[in-house]
């Protein structure tokens, strides 16, 4: 009967692996980063998939306890047979031995806490450190985390003083409860923010995406903003590299700091180095980022600029990749707008991509037209209605789940009705659906979070290691409070609704939906009110309006700035389309020229290679081969620069050429124009080790 648990473990591992493959670049990132993020994501998904099994197991144990026959006081039972479960209680599908869930939750809890509070923060700080030795990087990572955790220790000290003043005794169990309450408090308040935004934004985004005109206008707006961010990232990189060029001229080759400078220069792409050298020569070292000082810098100065180089190059690479993705999105939406009124009902693309035979059979042009132009909009609107209904149920249950008599929570009433008939299958399915919606709302908001343009999960293998580690930390810290909130909504947290049901194994190990005692008074009032306030603020777009008033452009209809940015996005996309058209025309001309050259020179080349009777002599001169009259199988154009010949490059090649070979990074980026025959390409060798800078 444990096949559901096995299926949940496999599904969690599969989803974590697929997500890591989509967002990360597994062949390029370090193996420790891959394993840590995979473990964090897998445990977070596993908690969501396993909670329904724990709920049904708890309800089954309660059923057995309620229907257990009471033995008569004067009757001695001499039978040695084991008493089976009552006939009213049927084992749920996911029933496992009693020792499985306690051991599973302990493994998940302590592994997640160890990863999210110790290992992953140290790894993140190590990756951002600009030192040039292992000892220096570890020292910087420890100092940064000591400052971070020092604030937590200060808060804990204040709480301990508060408890001591009240005259309460402290032991290990109470300290553990305080730590669990503090963690739950942090997670619950962050959950309020994420759910309050997502419960409104998820249905609204589905409805807006069902309107092709609105989606296209918003895509133009995002393209204009990404273009601005890309230009700012390029300017920031140029300023830092000009300063680096000045240091390169100041530090002599035989100086002890020269190897440190060479370590920084090896991370800078060749193209960017050459451009920085030209800018430095043109401005004479008087640019914004340049320095004209002849004083030798200290090692701390090099560490600081090394850290700036790492951060600026990551930002530039991410903006380049996101710009390419956004261009493909806009081009696709334009194709949809042009094909809506097509008479032959076949989807035609302005820039068609080469598709495999299987794609042409399973997803033909006619089928694509029916989906993109006829069925997709009604499907998205239907999903909008369903998610809006689910959001309304969640908000109502959040507002009323503290009510014991009468029970007003919708989710709690559904569980009670199914429990009365011992319909464990309905309980499992309903719990899974609700948790998956919580999961989608919370995690989709995390995937769109941007902190100072540093942490951002970009698809198509464009997410750096810092952002992957940060997302793993955030998921490990948010998943337990999210599941505790769900157990509170269905009235299965005994600290909220006592003496009603048995306690789940999850709450026994992970703790309860408790908060710090100082703020626990009135928590059942301000927690739902905060959730409702965030939902209303998102519904009326108060956050977007406030950011727009502060100068951060947001997509608001009937706003002059938004209209100007939409028009700017149209112009940028039109320029990009002209560039692609010129590249395609140049490639077609080169293809025709090569074909004509091969036809006209085939006879001459065959005689030239034969060297036999009637042919050319086999003697060679130094001038032979200058006009490509050698072996036709060797294509010089294949090794030439594709940009110089006007050949359109893939997005991966554009980014790799932009960042150069010196970065030792080949971006495995797959855009919608990715061809099937490129599947056999090797992304590149894995990194040399964790300490490449040493």
Curated annotation (Swiss-Prot):
Extracellular side: 1-3, 52-106, 166-181, 403-426, 489-514
Subcellular location per the Swiss-Prot or TrEMBL entry: Membrane
Keyword flag Transmembrane: yes
GO cellular component: membrane
Pfam families for the chain: LMBR1
Keywords: Coiled coil, Glycoprotein, Membrane, Transmembrane, Transmembrane helix
InterPro entries given in the database record: GPCR-associated_LMBR1, LMBR1-like_membr_prot
Family: Belongs to the LIMR family.
Protein name: LMBR1 domain-containing protein 2 homolog
Species annotation: Drosophila melanogaster
Lineage of origin: Eukaryota, Metazoa, Ecdysozoa, Arthropoda, Hexapoda
């Amino acid at each position: 009967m444990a096949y559901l648990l096995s299926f949940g473990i496999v599904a969690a591992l599969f989803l974590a692996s697929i997500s890591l493959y989509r967002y990360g670049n597994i062949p390029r990132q370090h193996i420790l980063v891959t394993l840590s993020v995979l473990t964090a994501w897998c445990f977070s998904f596993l908690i969501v998939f396993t909670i329904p099994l724990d709920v049904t197991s708890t309800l089954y144990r309660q059923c057995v306890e309620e229907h257990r026959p009471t033995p008569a006081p004067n009757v001695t039972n001499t039978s040695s047979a084991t008493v089976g479960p009552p006939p009213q209680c049927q084992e749920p599908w996911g029933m496992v031995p009693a020792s499985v869930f306690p051991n599973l939750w302990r493994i998940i809890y302590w592994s997640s806490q160890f990863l999210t509070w110790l290992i992953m923060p140290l790894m993140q700080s190590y990756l951002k450190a600009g030192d040039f030795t292992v000892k220096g990087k570890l020292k910087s990572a420890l100092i940064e985390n000591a400052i971070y955790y020092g604030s937590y220790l200060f808060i804990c000290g204040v709480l301990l003083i508060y408890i001591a003043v009240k005259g309460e005794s402290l032991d290990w169990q109470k300290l553990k409860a305080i730590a669990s309450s503090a963690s739950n408090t942090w997670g619950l308040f962050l959950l309020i923010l994420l759910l309050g935004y997502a419960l409104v934004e998820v249905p609204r985004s589905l409805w807006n995406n069902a309107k092709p005109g609105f989606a296209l206008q918003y895509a133009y707006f995002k393209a204009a903003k990404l273009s601005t961010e890309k230009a700012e990232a390029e300017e920031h990189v140029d300023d830092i590299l000009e300063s680096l060029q000045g240091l390169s001229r100041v530090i002599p080759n035989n100086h002890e700091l020269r190897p440190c400078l060479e370590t920084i220069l090896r991370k800078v792409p060749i193209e960017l180095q050459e451009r920085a050298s030209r800018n430095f020569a043109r401005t004479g070292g008087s640019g914004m980022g340049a320095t004209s000082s002849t004083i030798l810098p200290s090692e701390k100065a090099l560490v600081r600029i090394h850290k700036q180089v790492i951060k600026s190059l990551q930002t530039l690479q991410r903006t380049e990749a996101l710009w390419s993705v956004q261009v493909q999105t806009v081009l696709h939406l334009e194709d949809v707008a042009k094909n809506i009124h097509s008479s032959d009902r076949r989807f035609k693309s302005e820039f068609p991509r080469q598709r495999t035979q299987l794609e042409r059979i399973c997803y033909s042009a006619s089928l694509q037209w029916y989906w993109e132009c006829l069925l997709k909009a009604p499907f998205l609107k239907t999903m909008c209605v369903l998610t809006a209904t689910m959001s309304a149920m969640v908000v109502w249950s959040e507002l009323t789940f503290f009510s014991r008599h009468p029970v007003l929570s919708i989710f709690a009433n559904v569980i009670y009705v199914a429990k009365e008939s011992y319909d464990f299958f309905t309980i499992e399915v309903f719990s899974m659906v609700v948790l998956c919606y919580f999961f989608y709302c919370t995690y989709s908001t995390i995937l769109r979070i941007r902190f100072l343009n540093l942490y951002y999960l970009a698809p198509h293998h464009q997410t750096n290691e810092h952002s992957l580690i940060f997302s793993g930390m955030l998921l490990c810290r948010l998943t337990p409070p999210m599941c505790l909130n769900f157990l509170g909504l269905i009235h299965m947290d005994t600290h909220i609704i006592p003496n009603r049901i048995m306690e789940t194994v999850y709450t026994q190990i992970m703790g309860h939906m408790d908060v710090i005692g100082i703020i626990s008074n009135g928590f059942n009032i301000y927690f739902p009110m905060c959730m409702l306030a965030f939902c209303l603020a998102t519904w009326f777009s108060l956050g977007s309006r406030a950011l727009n008033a502060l100068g951060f452009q947001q997509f608001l209809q009937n706003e002059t700035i938004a209209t100007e940015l939409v028009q700017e996005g149209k112009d940028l996309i039109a320029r990009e389309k002209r560039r692609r058209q010129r590249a395609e025309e140049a490639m077609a001309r080169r293809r025709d020229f090569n074909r004509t050259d091969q036809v006209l020179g085939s006879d001459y080349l065959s005689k030239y290679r034969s060297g036999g009777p009637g042919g050319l002599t086999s003697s060679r001169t130094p001038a032979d081969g200058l006009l490509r009259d050698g072996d036709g199988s060797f294509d010089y154009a294949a090794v030439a620069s594709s940009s110089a010949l006007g050949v359109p490059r893939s997005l991966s090649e554009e980014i790799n050429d932009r960042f150069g070979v010196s970065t030792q990074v080949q971006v495995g980026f797959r855009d919608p124009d990715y061809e099937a025959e490129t599947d056999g390409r090797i992304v590149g060798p894995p990194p040399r080790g964790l300490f490449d800078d040493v």
